[in-house]
Amino acid sequence: MAATLGKTIVATGASSGLGFESVKQLLQQSQPYKFIIGARDLKTTQAAFDQVQYDAKTHSVSILPLDLADLRTVKPFAQQTLEALDQDKLDILFLNAGMNKAATGPGLHGSKWCEAYVVNHLSQHYLTQLLRPKLSASHSRVVVVSSGLIRAVKEADIEAFETTLKADSGADGFKVYHASKFVQFLGAHWWRRQLGTSATVLAVSPGLVIGTGLGRHLDTQPNLDHIPDKVTVDKGAKSLLRAFDCNDIPEDPEQIFLTSWGEWWPKDVYSLSLDKSLQDRWCPSQEDIEA
């Protein structure tokens, strides 16, 4: 089968919120895109995209089953994705899925980890492992949706991650979100090291976005009315899309964080994440994940 013209994007967390809006904005462009989207609720996600006005002769949207809270669904999704790609390049791996939820109750599907950690980091790290050969062969760009909250993490917090991120640790949603997003950022560094020059890995913040549904699992919803820098979903998506094709990437391989206002954070902002042994600790091998 001949390769598809245009860019091919594999996306997580694109059934609603920022991910959905990002895909929607790209579907309005004249450049062809082929999307492969992982979603837990196929029917609802398909219905949402059916409402988007786009040229189906120019773009394609395929929705495949993926429940990031269940590691067992990741490998079948990766296999179906590779089959769907066939000879096409994987131009962009868009890792957008995220949740804000307290670590209460037992881990899902027998996991020792809380659901938010599995969704925010472990499952998407595993997916990247499974797609690694294709990423290298395609010279892909891996776009990790991060958060400016990573700079609030302290050394004492990192030392407590093993406890905080365990299932039923009792840690509240905000503590779990800070920890899991920091670990996710460690993963971005780790993948930048592992993939080297064969692929590009970036982390990008959408800013403080309102109306995404990220905090729907929280018992108490934060009041953002007093925060002047909050942004809408469409503006947050524009910030994310900047990472898809920006060409001003710093030469320093550790300077990978693109802010919502389009600047690259200096490394001293996130110096704690530069510890390679810490990156290794939180980025298990495919074999360890499957054990």
From Swiss-Prot:
Task: Tell me its EC number(s), please.
Answer: 1.1.1.-
Q: Where does NADP(+) bind?
A: L18, D67, N96, Y177, K181, V209
Under Gene Ontology molecular function, one entry of this record is: oxidoreductase activity
Residue numbers annotated as active site: Y177 (proton acceptor), K181 (lowers pka of active site tyr)
Superkingdom of the source? Eukaryota
Inducers of expression: The expression of the dibenzodioxocinones biosynthesis cluster is positively regulated by the transcription factor dibT.
Q: Which UniProt keywords apply?
A: NADP, Oxidoreductase
Extract the Pfam families matched here.
Answer: adh_short
Q: In which pathway does it act?
A: Secondary metabolite biosynthesis
The Swiss-Prot or TrEMBL record describes its family as follows: Belongs to the short-chain dehydrogenases/reductases (SDR) family.
What this protein is reported to do is described as: Short-chain dehydrogenase/reductase; part of the gene cluster that mediates the biosynthesis of dibenzodioxocinones such as pestalotiollide B, a novel class of inhibitors against cholesterol ester transfer protein (CEPT). The biosynthesis initiates from condensation of acetate and malonate units catalyzed by the non-reducing PKS pks8/GME11356. Pks8/GME11356 lacks a thioesterase (TE) domain, which is important to the cyclizing of the third ring of atrochrysone carboxylic acid, and the esterase GME11355 might play the role of TE and catalyzes the cyclization reaction of the C ring.
User: What is this protein called in UniProt?
Assistant: Short-chain dehydrogenase/reductase GME11359
